Structure formats: structure tokens, C-alpha cells
Amino acid sequence: MAFQVNTNINALNAHAMGLVTQRELKESLERLSSGLRINKAADDASGMTIADSLRSQAKSLGQAIANTNDGMGIIQIADKAMDEQIKILDTIKVKATQAAQDGQNTQSRKALQADIVRLIQSLDNIGNTTSYNGQTLLSGAFSNKEFQVGAYSNETIKASIGSATSDKIGQVKITTGKNITASGEVALTFKQVDGVHDVSLESVKISTSAGTGLGVLAEVINKNSNATGVRATANVITTSDSAIKSGSLSSLTVNGIEIGNILGIKKNDSDGRLVAALNAVTAQTGVEAYTDSVGRLNLRSIDGRGINIKANSTNVDGQASALTTLNGGQDITRGSTNFGRLSLVRQDARDILVVSGANVSASAGYAAIGFAKGTTANTTVNLRDVLGEFNQAVRSASGANYNKTLASENLTLGSGVTTLRGAMVVMDIAESAQKMLDKVRSDLGSVQNQMVSTVNNITITQVNVKAAESQIRDVDFAQESANFSKNNILAQSGSYAMSQANTVQQNILRLLT
């Protein structure tokens, strides 16, 4: 055993171990005071990288939750505004329905129209002023907007809000065929009703017999309107080309029912003799007669069957014939036949493609019901059009020109609900507008539900990401307290060991005494 004075190996070892203990004690105190296991990169280089990534992800998820909540707020604002617009449209339709009966006079219809104008202005005011953070929501400008709903780029939800102003909603496609003058069997097919599929309807006979005619065809079309999106109205009205003259009608027949001779008919049928004779057999003919404001005879089919009226040219008791031509030039002595006009309405404004069967091209049309190419009256109207006057094109397309006699007058349909037919057009427009807004709201509801699901998911994800970061970054106090106690004891024992190592050197002095 060697004894040295210049180098105290035991003291040096004790000092070195004391330094290690002091460093570990310092790190332990740092962790206990900060609550973090990783306070600097040297503590855990790879763990710090992962923890920082998780922290960034958690913070981004927090902002994504805020973004999604903002998006839901926007949708809720738009949804409530459109809910109010739909209530306005309900009122417009009710007022149009109120105007669509001839118990209303011109003044009452004008009052209803004034109410409707105000309501449309209110609807437009909502559409133009509903906004979020300076962005209008219902003008059509809020389209294809994106909301970041994830921690990483391009994790988005898109939302669009369609226009809800009167010039963009309520589009209605109105189509009316020409007057039908030929009988026959009709079997219709509506082409590409949903853009792809065709819908074929049962066949209907067009004639003057009961249980036939455009009235039955309209019922068949309306029965299938859920599949086709098309509704139909049959207008079968025969009108004399001129006012009723003083005279007589010989051997008068309507739809095969003989009425006989009618004598002493006065001008404009002022005493109602002709109308009374015709209406006496309404149950057999299915035809109702009346005179209009200018003294013309009008025959209306009450069930939509065709109308055939005929009288001999022979004068009775020297009296001239009270009627000569009807329906734009049809001679009563040869027989005037009219099967009416079929009006079709589609509330999404797409073209109505109607043909005779699945093997006929859509462009061919179907002449038997008046829809041959070039012979139909087509137009599209929207809610904004209700504010002004419906023009002659709308009048014809809506079926208000029941026959050539009325069409030749080139009249307009008036403003909004100021006429019976105009009121019915407004009813269709209001219903179409309601459906359009309901579709927009339905789409927004789906987007909002998507956002709710996303928020629920990323909220849980954020919690789990923070938990994962905590596992890496945060200190385990129980474990670290044990480490601190160990290092504290080692520091104290190290100091004692160094003191003893220095004392050992004094034993050399005993060798010198």
C-alpha cells in the first residue's frame, strides 16, 4: 500500500462524484420547480421534437375549433334569415290564393297586390342586409367558401349559400301547347325528369265523351307530379269570334246532344235564352255556357272533355243565324271542335321534355297534345316579375289565352294577382321560391351537421394530443421527488466522504513521529 501526500485520490473521487450528484440535483430541482421533464433540448432531444409537434397540433386544433364555430355561426345567421323569408313567402302565397277566386273585384285584387309588393320588398331587404363580418350572406356572393377545420393545411369544409333575393328565386317554367283540334289516344313520356330517367304515363283518350279529354290527361300528369316535377292544367273553352247577334240557331247540337232550334235570340243574348238552352243539358254535354263582357258566347268544359258545337245554316222563320264562327274561324255549320290547351308548370324552371314514348326523340315534341315544335308558348318567370306587369308571353304560356279568339286580342295578364290567372301564376312562383329556399336551408343544415361532427371529433383529438404531449413533456412528480431525495442524500454523503478523504492524509504524519 502506497502513501502519497501530493495527490489525494480519494478526495478527487469524492469531488468528482459530488459534481455528478450536484448536476443531477440541479436538474431534479429544475424539473420539480417547472413541472416539466424537458426544460431544454439536452433533456430529451427526440422527445422535445415530438412534444413540440404535438403542442403545435393541439394549438392548431384549438383554432380549427374556433373556425368551425365561426362557420356554424354564419350558417345559423343565414338559416334564421331564410326562415323569416319563407314565412314571408307563405304570406305571399296565401294572398295569391285569396286573389285566385272571382269573388274578388279589381280593387280588392289591387290591394292584395300592393301587400304582396311590400312583402317582396321585405324579402329583398332581408336578402340584401343579412351579413357576417361585412360579407352579405344571401345575395349569392357567399359561394364556395372554405373553413379550415384541421391542424394541417387543406383540411377544410366548404359552404355555399345561394341567393335569396326575389330576382334569383321562384323560377317557374310555364308551357302551354296550341289548341288541340284532333282526337286520339295519348300516352306521354316525360324525358329526363331528374336529368337521367324518363317517366311514362298511362294512356288517355282525347275526345268529347265523358271520362276523356285533357281534363283526364291533366289528372294523370298531376298524379305523377312527384316523379316528374310537372303539374298540368287543362283549359277547354270555346269562344265565338264575335258577339251574339239577334237571330236563331237551327238544329243546335253540343257534344252529340241535340238541343234543337232556338228562336228569338237577342243581341248579346241579353235575356239569357241561348245560355239557358245550352246549360239545360250540361249534365249530358259536360259543357257550361256563359256570355262575356262583350257579348260573346263562351262554352267551358266542366270536366276537361272536348267541345263540339254545330248548327245548320238554315234560317228559322226568316231569322239570321245568331252565331257564325268560333275559335278563330271555325264555321259553326261545319262544326267547331276544340279539345283545349294543356298548360304545364315546372317549378325548377328546367325545360319540359314531353314525347309520345320512350323511343321518340325529345326534340320531336308531341303534336297530339299541342306541343309540336314551334307551336308552344314558353316562358320563365321569377318572384321579381310579380312586382311588374306580366306580359302577353306570360299570358299565353300560362294558358290564359284559352283559344285563338282570346289570343288575337293580344292582352297582357296584368300585374301580379290583379287577374285570376295572374294570381295562379303567383301561387306557383311563391311555392317554387319556398322550395328553393328550403333546399338552400337543407344544404346548410347538412353542412352545419358536418361541422358539429367535426368539432366533436377534433375536440376529443385535441384532448388526446395534449395528453400525449403531457406524457412526454411533463414531469412525474412522484418519480422526480424520489430522485431528488436520492440526490440530496448523495450530496450530503458526498460531502462527508470528501471530509473523510482529507482526514486520511493526516495518517502519514504518524509515520514521521
Curated annotation (Swiss-Prot):
User: For this protein, what is any one GO molecular function term?
Assistant: structural molecule activity
> Which keywords does this chain's UniProt record carry?
Bacterial flagellum, Secreted, Virulence
Subcellular localization, as worded in the UniProt entry = Secreted; Bacterial flagellum
User: Signal sequence: where?
Assistant: none
Per the record, the domain of life is Bacteria
Provide one Gene Ontology cellular component. bacterial-type flagellum
The question of whether Secreted is a record keyword is answered with yes
Which ranges of the sequence are coiled-coil? none
Self-association and partners: Heteromer of FlaA and FlaB. FlaB is located proximal to the hook while the remainder of the filament is composed of the predominant FlaA.
Q: What family is reported?
A: Belongs to the bacterial flagellin family.
Q: What does this protein do?
A: Flagellin is the subunit protein which polymerizes to form the filaments of bacterial flagella. Important for motility and virulence.
Database matches in NCBIfam families: PRK12584.1 (NF009234), PRK13588.1 (NF010115)
State what protein this is by name: Flagellin A
